[in-house]
């Protein structure tokens, strides 16, 4: 076995009824963009649980993140983040929603005049990002 150190400063909350913990974990004064995919969260009850937990916060919804998110879709969310002063992203859904939201977080803080696509295409460094939470 190799010697190594691993530091992963991520708070993971797991289990039944844990969505309510968002009330404690998302800053009270946050301007939140909630991202999701095709709308299953509205059919399975997760949407209501998330919105209940986020009461008192400004929440802007961005739905329609498709499987294997398209750059154009994510960039629409980036523009909203910039226009609305979003300072917290909450991805609600599966892997594609989380992947798209991670890109949105980095692209929204990418230097003006530069193309955020370089993060994916050229491996450009991410120097700043909007904080992210996720409900999977």
Which sequence ranges carry the predicted segments?
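ATP/NTP phosphate-donor binding region
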Residues: 1-88
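Glycine/threonine-rich beta-strand-loop-alpha-helix active-site module
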Residues: 72-136
């Amino acid at each position: 076995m190799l010697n190594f150190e691993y530091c992963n400063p991520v708070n993971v909350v797991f289990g039944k009824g844990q969505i309510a913990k968002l009330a404690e974990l998302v800053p009270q004064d946050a301007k939140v963009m909630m991202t999701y995919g095709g709308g299953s969260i509205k059919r399975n009850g997760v949407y209501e649980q998330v919105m209940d937990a986020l009461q008192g916060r400004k929440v802007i919804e961005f739905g329609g993140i498709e499987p294997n998110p398209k750059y154009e879709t994510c960039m629409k969310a980036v523009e909203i983040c910039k226009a609305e002063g979003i300072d917290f992203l909450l991805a609600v859904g599966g892997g594609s929603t989380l992947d798209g939201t991670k890109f949105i977080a980095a692209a929204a803080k990418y230097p003006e005049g530069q193309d955020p696509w370089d993060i994916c295409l050229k491996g450009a460094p991410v120097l700043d990002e909007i904080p992210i939470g996720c409900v999977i």
